[in-house]
Amino acid sequence: MATAAAAAAVMAPPGCPGSCPNFAVVCSFLERYGPLLDLPELPFPELERVLQAPPPDVGNGEVPKELVELHLKLMRKIGKSVTADRWEKYLIKICQEFNSTWAWEMEKKGYLEMSVECKLALLKYLCECQFDDNLKFKNIINEEDADTMRLQPIGRDKDGLMYWYQLDQDHNVRMYIEEQDDQDGSSWKCIVRNRNELAETLALLKAQIDPVLLKNSSQQDNSSRESPSLEDEETKKEEETPKQEEQKESEKMKSEEQPMDLENRSTANVLEETTVKKEKEDEKELVKLPVIVKLEKPLPENEEKKIIKEESDSFKENVKPIKVEVKECRADPKDTKSSMEKPVAQEPERIEFGGNIKSSHEITEKSTEETEKLKNDQQAKIPLKKREIKLSDDFDSPVKGPLCKSVTPTKEFLKDEIKQEEETCKRISTITALGHEGKQLVNGEVSDERVAPNFKTEPIETKFYETKEESYSPSKDRNIITEGNGTESLNSVITSMKTGELEKETAPLRKDADSSISVLEIHSQKAQIEEPDPPEMETSLDSSEMAKDLSSKTALSSTESCTMKGEEKSPKTKKDKRPPILECLEKLEKSKKTFLDKDAQRLSPIPEEVPKSTLESEKPGSPEAAETSPPSNIIDHCEKLASEKEVVECQSTSTVGGQSVKKVDLETLKEDSEFTKVEMDNLDNAQTSGIEEPSETKGSMQKSKFKYKLVPEEETTASENTEITSERQKEGIKLTIRISSRKKKPDSPPKVLEPENKQEKTEKEEEKTNVGRTLRRSPRISRPTAKVAEIRDQKADKKRGEGEDEVEEESTALQKTDKKEILKKSEKDTNSKVSKVKPKGKVRWTGSRTRGRWKYSSNDESEGSGSEKSSAASEEEEEKESEEAILADDDEPCKKCGLPNHPELILLCDSCDSGYHTACLRPPLMIIPDGEWFCPPCQHKLLCEKLEEQLQDLDVALKKKERAERRKERLVYVGISIENIIPPQEPDFSEDQEEKKKDSKKSKANLLERRSTRTRKCISYRFDEFDEAIDEAIEDDIKEADGGGVGRGKDISTITGHRGKDISTILDEERKENKRPQRAAAARRKKRRRLNDLDSDSNLDEEESEDEFKISDGSQDEFVVSDENPDESEEDPPSNDDSDTDFCSRRLRRHPSRPMRQSRRLRRKTPKKKYSDDDEEEESEENSRDSESDFSDDFSDDFVETRRRRSRRNQKRQINYKEDSESDGSQKSLRRGKEIRRVHKRRLSSSESEESYLSKNSEDDELAKESKRSVRKRGRSTDEYSEADEEEEEEEGKPSRKRLHRIETDEEESCDNAHGDANQPARDSQPRVLPSEQESTKKPYRIESDEEEDFENVGKVGSPLDYSLVDLPSTNGQSPGKAIENLIGKPTEKSQTPKDNSTASASLASNGTSGGQEAGAPEEEEDELLRVTDLVDYVCNSEQL
């Protein structure tokens, strides 16, 4: 799909859907909400294809089905009943709401004929309608967060451009860029359509930040793409292919020019080098990257070869650097192409540099470009679009026509600049060719080209080619000439180069003067060219004279260049400096005219050169250029020198006026003649660094426009400069690089060149002693500030003056004095203005923003300071001081404008702490943003990181996709492949089924095991404890029964032996030993029933069994009572108190029938209190126990049966009495509720039964009390009391009662008090009843059992009397005791024992019999023993029955 997308993009017409912002919107909607709306999936290329109108012969004039389906679904989703055959009519109706004009067009022409923009806008409108008219969709969307509904840009670059990244399901990539404040989509552009373009874009973005990457990439790619234009990568990308072509052409041009350039530059490039070096110094800042780009591929080879050639040629030391420069210049044209391809500000300077080569038209172009540079500097503070408009006005009008192919209006000026830069590079290459081949022609053409660039770009290029051709023919002669006079001719060439470059710098000022200057240069150069052998001598003479004239003119041109630089600076500082610059320009132009006349006169001694140069210059340039052309070389050179030197001077000259400018120019002309010689040497270096100089010029442009680019360019040029300087040092060429004040920004590489250039200067001085020039030290080291640059220029001028003739020395002295004055004035002006500009340079010096630049600059400074420590150190110190003074105001000046004003509007980056004014950003911010804010460089880095992640992810996805496709392709030839894949799945499925079956079987087995384990657990658990309980219980019971430990056997006889004993005694013993085990035994019995209960756990079984067992005890009592003494129960006289206590005891008995856990707890709690009082009385009641023990045999016989029956009743009762569970918390309420329920049960059973029970209760209350007390004692002992506890209770007697009673009142005041009161009178009456206690105890048991029967009968239906009629062996002794024990004894035990123990045991019992048994293991075991005895008795009785 990616290839298809690329093909579609290539074939797409200008109205390609991919270039429309709506296309990205629709794609984003389809990707985000397509599945939700069930829309057809359309990858990017497919959507582009269907939206584009197919050719008439394709598709039969039908709209693609995919597009129709998409529209149909979208319209139907918003409630339109659309049919497939009439969908266009419905679409027209919808379009009426959206755009009536389009609806009319569609109605007339049909959907197929509509423009892509219209189709996309309609499709976007339909998509947006979903949010309003599709209710179902709307409801779903309303739940989403707004941020999740939107696609956010992936990042922003240094220039404020937003990058949008989209990826579809087929891994097709689209990346778009646009201005942040773009409202109409005018800046929208698609820059990436496939993976490779994404990688290229990422490389370009990285190169902008990391100059090393840029350098490497540029070396790898001749294309200037790699030296990215800071402003628009989009333009770069679009222009990349044309740039590559242009680069190839420029390389070819350069290769052709190289022989010519090498020969011409042997002489002419010396001059050009000086000028080029100056320009390079200026340009290096800006041009360094483009220069590097140019140099990167061609330069390494060409420069190395040239260096070798230069080293091989002794005389060509001057020429050698020229050759190097020629190749570098060739690289420059490449770079210019690249820079042109990349709409970088590099163009103007490069064009200026190339302008030297091409024509006066180019010179005019260069001047316009310089003006544009100034504007760019000024516009750097203006929003991009405005800048672009202004730049397009400035640059595009002169340059655009042939060169610019602007992708977007904003980028047009960039492209224009790039193209101009390419032209300048070509011009530079021609300059180099001319310099090597035809020095005179080169100079002339260079000046012509410089003059011409303002006028026409095409003629410049034409001249460029002509120059190459011309340079070819004279190249040989000139090489020969250069051998003899190479140094002088080179100096003249350098002068012309410098002049051209000065013109470039001062181009806007010089538009008028540029033509004349270029003509002068052309004359001088052509005169030199015309006189190949002697003329070169003349050329050298002319160059010296021209240098003088140039020095005078250079004062003017330098003032102009200064004004240019001042203007360039002023845009940086703000447009304030322009008016003085304009004045300077006017003065400079006037002075130039006068100087041009003077220079023409001075040059007249060389009439041949001048006329020829004028002829050539007139051809390319204007007649003015012809007139002033000979001095124009000087002027250009001087302008270059002066412009570099005299940016300050320009300001000062603007203040001083035309006259002062003229004076300065005269002095500077002298110095410049010397300086031109120096610069010729410099031109050798500069042309080696020729690329660097245009790069600097462009760099200055770029600096003004984009500070970001400057660093990489400078860094790259720094390396190139070092190489060039090393070559020049070998050659012995001395370079004086004058740094224009505007290039305050570190031209660190030029600085590096300066120390090397000084060495080369020394070498060249030795070689060029005939010339007698002392090379100026390059002011680049101090370039960051205009003051330093001027000071350095002055010092360099001083050095030159010393090495040169006395006239030159005088001129240098005058220039020094003038420059000092000018420096003072300019320092005042520039301190106010330049200092504003300086903050940029200062900031860069501080390294806060352009760290790379400053690193290089610091290195260069260190190198330069090594050679120039005396001058540079003081100057740098001054710069630092001025910078510190400015920075002292604010630690963080704006990194964009360098001004610390309005600190409240300076935003600090959250990652690097760089400060930026809100108005200096692009687009400017009106408010301080919330949250994190990152400066443009940091945003650029983040963008690179994110794009790199996306690229890696894309590579992974594409690899997977490719593998899948390969697999499919392979499988196509294997028919069984699919089947081969499926069969393994089927066996897997069968295995899964088998596993499932096994799992199901296992689960069933687990279930069975679970049930069996329940039974097993209960059985094994109970039997273990049961055996132990039997042993322990039997031993204890036997010991107690025998009067303390008479050991009987553990066989049944011993158990049945208890039958002879009083049940009370046995029960007491059992109580003491086994409090809970009885429950456990009951639980076991119950668990037998429970085996049918799936839900019941062992714990529940035990609990229920215990409760049932207790209830069964009560029921047994009832049966026994009714059977044995039905009459006695009536005979017993009832006492109200006793009846109350009996009633409570009955409640307690019944209590077990209620939910077991609660009932146990309640019983334990309540009986504790009630029967704690009875404990003392029970001691006196042992007689009654004895009498009961007589009946123990009978009880034991029928006890089990009655238990079973009662347990059954208890089950029923449990159902009825689960309500009591609520009253666990309050025993009082439980008791009351129990009483009420019992009463209710009595009523239910029968009123008669109730009456009989009441009468029985009243009669047998006292007896019942006594029996209950004994039973309570037993219950206590069995439930929770160890024998020691019981003994203590018996011993303490009343005190224990008091304790328990207190506890009772605390816990259950109402019910317990009532019971306690009833119990107390019963106690009082007990002594009376003692004689008849035996029977009475029986009776109360009977009575209780009868009452319980009534309560139980409520569940049953029969009357309790029926039970009394039933003949059962008397088990009263045991059953009533046990029942009472369970009901009463346990709670009494609780009351007697510490509440903690009682509660703990109760909770344990309630939670599970196991817990209860463990807690009171011996007691429970005894209880179990009793239960076992009961079972044995029952078995015996049943056998007897």
Curated annotation (Swiss-Prot):
Single biological process term from Gene Ontology: positive regulation of viral transcription
CDD domains attached to this UniProt entry: PHD_RSF1
Function: Regulatory subunit of the ATP-dependent RSF-1 and RSF-5 ISWI chromatin-remodeling complexes, which form ordered nucleosome arrays on chromatin and facilitate access to DNA during DNA-templated processes such as DNA replication, transcription, and repair. Binds to core histones together with SMARCA5, and is required for the assembly of regular nucleosome arrays by the RSF-5 ISWI chromatin-remodeling complex. Directly stimulates the ATPase activity of SMARCA1 and SMARCA5 in the RSF-1 and RSF-5 ISWI chromatin-remodeling complexes, respectively.
Residue ranges occupied by any DDT domain in the UniProt entry: 17-84
Phosphothreonine found at: 628, 1278, 1305
Coiled-coil annotated spans: 942-1012
Biased composition (Basic and acidic residues): 234-257, 274-283, 330-340, 359-378, 467-480, 500-514, 565-601, 609-621, 753-770, 789-802, 816-831, 1335-1344
Modified residues (N6-acetyllysine): 1050, 1339
Tissues where this protein is expressed: Ubiquitously expressed. Highly expressed in the heart, skeletal muscle, kidney and placenta. Expressed at low levels in the brain and colon.
Summary of subunit composition and partner proteins: Component of the RSF-1 ISWI chromatin-remodeling complex at least composed of SMARCA1 and RSF1. Within the RSF-1 ISWI chromatin-remodeling complex interacts with SMARCA1. Component of the RSF-5 ISWI chromatin-remodeling complex (also called the RSF complex) at least composed of SMARCA5/SNF2H and RSF1. Within the RSF-5 ISWI chromatin-remodeling complex interacts with SMARCA5/SNF2H; the interaction is direct. Identified in a centromere complex containing histones H2A, H2B and H4, and at least CENPA, CENPB, CENPC, CENPT, CENPN, HJURP, SUPT16H, SSRP1 and RSF1.
Gene Ontology CC, one term: nucleoplasm
Compositional bias (Polar residues): 215-227, 482-498, 552-562, 1394-1408
Acidic residues: compositionally biased ranges: 874-887, 1094-1107, 1120-1141, 1189-1199, 1280-1292
Designated name of the protein: Remodeling and spacing factor 1
Zinc finger (PHD-type) stretch: 891-941
Record-listed cross-link Glycyl lysine isopeptide (Lys-Gly) (interchain with G-Cter in SUMO1), residues: 277, 456
Molecular function terms, GO-annotated: histone binding; histone octamer slider activity; zinc ion binding
